[in-house]
Amino acid sequence: SNYSNFKVFAANRKISGFRIRLFFDNKQDSRVRSEELVNDFTEQYPETPAYRTHTSPFFKVTVGDFRNMSDAMRFLKTIERSYPSAFIVRENINPPR
């Protein structure tokens, strides 16, 4: 179908960049906590994409699609009061629209 072709195309368009890791844990309540975190973050920052991933046994929440470190730093400064343990990670990102 056209839809699955589009999904493959979209996945291949990822580029190298930076995101901000808000959460990384493998405790019993990590699934629930990571879901709540995504919901809270998305309410506060609706313009910034939030990605929740599970790489057994860890749940991770990572946010943003930043092409360069300075953009990531700027956003980290914006959120550091709400998310004091947040840090920048280098990841493949979705190109900003």
Feature locations, PLM:
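Acidic/polar low-complexity segments and flexible, solvent-exposed patches
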Residues: S1-R97
